[in-house]
Amino acid sequence: AGMVAQPIAMDEQSLLSMIDRRVELANTDDANSSRLLLLILDGITDPRNLGACIRSAASMGVDAIIVPKDKSAPLNEAASKTASGGASLVPVVSVVNLARCIGQLQKRQVWVVGTLLETEQMLHQVDMQDNIAIVMGSEGKGIRQKTAKCCDFLVKIPMVNADLGFNVSVAAGIALYEVQKQRRY
């Protein structure tokens, strides 16, 4: 059996310091290269789904993944294996209070975009050129109401058969791709 990549843990204070540095950079330097992309996972309890989200995040250049301490999958071997090396590329930040953390992001010029099934605005209709945090919820329940209330935008991913829906890692990949598409192409 091969070695499983060790996940990078980062605390909330280190995350906020990193964001402060990046926002400062964006004001002086080439704004394109210093724009933030964060992924917030609200209530993802299956380690394999967590791992698959980490893999999608790593593929799409996410700077950090934020998860709540409670009701969140452990970053265990199953998660790391599913992440296929992505766990060593993207820090995972476990926070005590997700709503408060989102508020801290917003104070630092990060737009927070929540994904829901039942909302009017489509993912591609939001301008994602600035610092962005994408919020994904659990497949069963979606993002919590308290989390949704904190978001700057609530969007849905257009689907042909919406009653089937996507696995959360697939939905995360689509949302992150949309950010990169708007920024790069």
Cite the ranges covered by each PLM segment.
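Conserved beta/loop motifs at nucleotide-recognition and modification sites
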Residues: 9-10
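Active-site/ligand-binding-proximal alpha/beta "capping" segment
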Residues: 113-168
